[in-house]
Regions:
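Sec-dependent signal peptide recognition
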Residues: 1-9
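Covalent nucleotidyltransferase
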Residues: 19, 30-116
């Protein structure tokens, strides 16, 4: 029974922690002057949040990225989209769930925010 309580604690603490990151989400801008802003195309990939040590999903769950993939990531938080090419969302999602490191070479983390 203790094991069940412990697992529930881990589950809910991860969800709470994920919400604390306050990720930037898509929104519509109306009547705002966007002159001077930098904008990019919406990439159809998988959200990737690097906290300085671990690559996490939008939900705050660790992604099984191999060491070579994150070796050059900075020691601070970056937020972006794991992407390979258009119309490949299913493959991208599959790779981000896979422990097969060779497939990760197809992906790039396109950074769009540096929180804090």
């Amino acid at each position: 029974m203790r094991a069940i309580y412990f697992l529930l604690y881990l589950l809910f603490s991860q969800i709470t922690w994920a919400n604390e990151r306050d990720l930037m989400l898509l929104s519509t801008y109306e009547n705002q002057d966007v002159q001077g802003w930098v904008m990019s195309e919406k990439l159809d990939g998988v959200r990737g949040y690097w906290d300085g040590k671990t690559l996490l999903s939008r939900q705050g769950l660790p992604l099984p990225a191999p060491t070579y993939f994150t070796a050059q990531f900075p020691p601070f938080a970056i937020d972006g989209e794991l992407f390979s090419e258009r119309n490949q969302f299913e493959e991208i999602a599959s790779i981000t769930k896979s422990f097969k490191g060779d497939n990760w070479a197809k992906l790039t983390l396109y950074v769009f925010d540096v929180p804090n």
